[in-house]
Amino acid sequence: TVNAANLQPVKKGYAVAVADTQNSFGFSGLANVVKYVSEHSEINAFGGWYNSDNNMYYFDATVIVDDLATAKELGRINKQIAIFDLANLTEIRL
């Protein structure tokens, strides 16, 4: 997961994918995510997620949230399978 403004890795907070870019795969999926991020100033990061249940890698526009409860709620609102704890590099299934 990288900061959309400076492309530097984000090392803390919880990454929550945005529903509008879920199911983005391959180079065209990555291009779709980058375009979406450039058009939505509220999105502060983008990255990828490996789903071990189906062995697929997803690209996502992402919001970084500092509070776990808020991140979980935002994840549920966006119909996400999981969010990611960037400080501890752990997936949190919802």
Place the predicted regions along the sequence by residue.
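Conserved, structured core segments of small domains
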Residues: 1-94
